[in-house]
Regions:
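Long, positively charged amphipathic alpha-helical accessory segments at protein N-termini or as interdomain linkers
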Residues: 94-122, 132-266
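Short loop/turn and capping residues at structural boundaries
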Residues: 4-6, 125-126, 168
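N-terminal lobe of the biotin/lipoate ligase/transferase fold
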Residues: 1-116, 138
Length: 266
């Protein structure tokens, strides 16, 4: 039991030991685990390690990030002890277009891990956010380290932040929530890593159906920014490449391969 200022007490899992050794023992493949109580950003640290010559499969994990990063230059709120912040690094040596599906794989890995160790069924907001009960509980930032001479991806850095028991979020962070279940952090990290390892080398067809089934967007009225302006549409389907097919207000269809989607409130 942990005391929470002005809020009484919050139950935590028994013996929630969160360190590299505890994470490592439940990982079912050969993977180096580098753990920090606090770090600026697990993605940033992973890229520093790659720059210093790391060429193995490794996992950077932190109990807190002081400068967590999200997509499109946004920050990712990463307070101590209430979430897990991890970066998984693989070296696929593949063409850039073949690495695009890794973000989709990461979403599926997080959802499968949550389903395995809790009773929660998460949903996916295209392209790479995980939601529970209509609120975001996980963000994913995938970055590629490329070789310009060969036009291949030498390393892929997959950053994942999951809110487990975070109760208060700073102003400006909208629609965020937490898993709010009794789960051991090391167990969750290991489960995500195991799923990731299986999926990143799998063909897209192995997991795209799962991604579709867990989508929260299909049939919803949405908008996205195009040429600096809001464009209104209805989400129709996710195609075999993971792109989002939408119907515009004028009846035309369009295929989105990247960008930020917002569900319109009814």
């Amino acid at each position: 039991i942990e005391a929470v200022t002005n809020r009484g007490y919050r139950l935590l899992p028994d013996n929630d030991i969160f360190d590299g050794e505890t994470i490592k023992k439940d990982i079912d493949f050969d993977c180096r685990v580098v753990f920090y109580d606090s770090i600026d950003s697990t993605n940033t640290q992973a890229k520093r390690m790659i720059s210093d010559g790391a060429d193995d499969v490794f996992l950077v994990v932190a109990a807190e990030q002081t400068a967590g990063r999200g997509r499109q230059g946004k920050s990712f709120y990463s307070p101590a002890d209430t979430g897990v912040y991890m970066t998984f690094v693989v070296h696929p040596n593949t063409a850039l277009q073949n690495a695009v599906g890794i973000t989709t794989a990461a979403c599926v890995a997080v959802c499968r891990a949550i389903e395995k160790i809790t009773d929660i069924t998460p949903q996916i907001k295209w392209v790479n956010d995980v939601y529970v009960n209509g609120k975001k509980i996980c963000g994913i930032l995938t970055e590629a380290v490329t070789d310009f001479e060969t036009q291949t991806v030498s390393s892929v850095v997959i950053g994942i932040g999951i809110n487990i028991s975070t109760e208060h979020f700073p102003d400006g962070i909208e629609n965020a929530s937490s898993l709010n279940v009794n789960v051991k952090r090391a167990q969750l990290v290991s489960a995500v890593a195991n799923e990731l390892n299986r999926l990143v080398c799998s063909p897209f067809s192995d997991y795209i159906d799962y991604y579709r089934e867990h989508s929260m967007l299909i049939g919803e009225d949405i908008y996205f920014i195009k040429n600096g302006e809001k464009t209104y549409a209805k989400a129709l389907a996710i195609d075999s490449d993971g792109a989002l097919e939408v119907e515009l207000e004028n009846g035309e269809t369009e295929t989105l391969r990247s960008g930020e989607i917002t569900v319109r409130k009814k």
